[in-house]
Every structure is written in C-alpha cells, then in structure tokens.
Amino acid sequence: MPKTVITPPGTQTPIAPFSPGTLADGIVYVSGTLAFDKDNNVAFPGDAEAQTRQVLETIKSVIETAGGTMEDVTMNHIFLTDWVHYAPMNKVYAEYFPGDKPARYCIQCGLVKPGFVVEIASVAHIGKT
C-alpha cells in the first residue's frame, strides 16, 4: 500500500519531524494540529475559539489537498490543556461538523508550548463515507 505525504500549498515547515498528513488506501491521517502563526509561534495564546478555528482550517486544508472534505472525517482526537476550553472549542467544532458528527474523544493534557490550549488530530476516509 503506497503512502503519500500531504502538504497543502503554503504550509509552514513543521517544527518537528512529521508530515501535516498522509494518505494511504483512501484514508487521510492528519497529524496533531496546533495554532501556529506565520513565524511558528503560538497563535492566539489562550484563546480556545480562535485556536480551534485555525486548527480546523488547517485540518480542512490537509483533507482537501488529499481530495476530500470535512464530511469525510470519521474520527477526531482532541487535546485540551484545561476543561475550561471545552465549551469554546465545541462552539467552533459544531460549525465544521454540522451534520453527521465524526467519532471523537477529548482529553485534558499538557501541550508542547505554553499558550496552546487546543490540539486536534483527524482521520478521514476519502470517498468512503
């Protein structure tokens, strides 16, 4: 099964050794995605709504580059630094998944830099939903 690295046009070089996404057998695996600004610093420090929107736009870009849509997302892995961010994250999340909702889980944990409050990784099945 061949694997294709998915890097949307204009994507910044990741600060760690990973690809924004990979496509294999019609399945897109989107790496854990954080809200970085153009200089690879934390965008919108502490703002769960703004970070969630940027994260989901980045995920959408990866999935669309692979030939899919957000309707193809079947699973989301959500990481929050504090449960206080749960409601603001869900407010934005619902905008991106208005119909049938993907499976997901959400856990509280530390993230790689202070100021990040939301990280999401996704799986999408292109053309199979």
UniProtKB/Swiss-Prot annotation:
Enzyme Commission no: 3.5.-.-
GO MF terms, alphabetically ordered: deaminase activity
Reaction(s) the record says it catalyses: (Z)-3-aminoacrylate + H2O + H(+) = 3-oxopropanoate + NH4(+)
GO cellular component, one term: cytosol
Keyword line: Hydrolase
Record-linked Gene3D superfamilies: RutC-like
Pfam families: Ribonuc_L-PSP
Biological processes, Gene Ontology terms: nitrogen utilization; uracil catabolic process
Matching NCBIfam families: RutC
Similarity-based family: Belongs to the RutC family.
Its job: Involved in pyrimidine catabolism. Catalyzes the deamination of 3-aminoacrylate to malonic semialdehyde, a reaction that can also occur spontaneously. RutC may facilitate the reaction and modulate the metabolic fitness, rather than catalyzing essential functions.
This protein's name: 3-aminoacrylate deaminase RutC
